[in-house]
Amino acid sequence: MITERQRQILNLIVSLYAKDHTPIGSKSLLDSIQASSATIRNDMKALERLGLIQKEHTSSGRIPSVSGYKYFVENVIQLEEFSQNDLFKVMKAFDGDFYRLSDLFKTAAKSLSELTGLTSFVLNAPQRDQQLVSFEMVMLDNHSVLSVITLGTGEVRTNQFILPKSMTEADLAVFSNLVKERLVGKKVIDIHYTLRTEIPQIVQRYFKVTSEVLQLFESIFDDLFKEHLTVAGHKNIFDYATDNLAELYKLFSDDERMLHEIREITNNDEMRAVKFDNDEKFMKNLTIISQKFVIPYRGFGTLTVVGPVEMDYQRTLSVLDLVAKVLTMKLSDYYRYLDGNHYEISK
């Protein structure tokens, strides 16, 4: 346990070091701490013994340690009001109407990346507990078909595809009835199971060429089973990482691995999570920060940034909080739009 003055000193060292990455000496703290230079030096020695700050080899000053950053984020930091400049930039980015959920997430990821200078990720809420409430298929012409899936949240998914050569319009009607009888009313997680157990056997009874029918099932429903990760700021790693660039770039391009990292640190009820001690050797000097945001009627999505341990946590957390609030506001508008019997067209 550290004293209140030591807490103030740690706060100042972290904040000052984030600005110019210069080791901090006791004289730099005199104007902000009501104590003598000797008292401040003693408190700095106490913080050093606790492993919260450390000596920089080329200077007599001190810099925050990984443990110091962790303590700062968990016990010291207090979120300040976001700056008017940041608020203007985020509101401008989200200005206008959004008709696709993916566009909202892309805007959020880009805003996070540009304002923090870090690599950012946006994760949608899991869809496994959503219910399929209706399914329709519409012939657009002799060859093109539009499938329309409606979920319990009011969200509508559409998928345009070319009718397989082996299928007639009569076959399409049978297909549609199968979906309505076997899948409508079920949760997404149960649909996933049914498609892999019951449906292949049923398809054999109704269709001569089963492979194309099963592929059609997969084409229409596969997107429901995926967690979608939106990424921005890949190139920012060149600004904050000097080692293992290839490994980092590979990680940030691998949705499954990043999903694992994000899920690992957000697997609790906390709205915000910070991971300092990463098992991956090439990420030992990096920090992962995730913050949940509300998705109306669906639960929580996650905003994540990855950056250097010595990042400006005060600003980064403030920007995360700002983007989360604006994104939730725009998501509310988006779902009101869907409630007006509109739906987005999937590419």
Curated annotation (Swiss-Prot):
Domain of life, per the record? Bacteria
> What job does the chain carry out?
Negative regulator of class I heat shock genes (grpE-dnaK-dnaJ and groELS operons). Prevents heat-shock induction of these operons.
The opening ranks of the lineage are: Bacteria, Bacillati, Bacillota, Bacilli, Lactobacillales
The record's annotation in Gene3D superfamilies points to: 3.30.450.40, Heat-inducible transcription repressor hrca homolog, domain 3, Winged helix-like DNA-binding domain superfamily/Winged helix DNA-binding domain
Q: What protein name is recorded for this chain?
A: Heat-inducible transcription repressor HrcA
Q: Which UniProt keywords apply?
A: Repressor, Stress response, Transcription, Transcription regulation
**Which family does the record claim for this protein?**
Belongs to the HrcA family.
InterPro entries with a match to the protein in the record: GAF-like_dom_sf, HrcA, HrcA_C, WH-like_DNA-bd_sf, WH_DNA-bd_sf, WHTH_HrcA_DNA-bd, WHTH_transcript_rep_HrcA_IDD
Q: Which organism is it from?
A: Lactococcus lactis subsp. cremoris (strain MG1363)
HAMAP family hit by this protein: HrcA (MF_00081)
One MF term from GO for this chain?
DNA binding
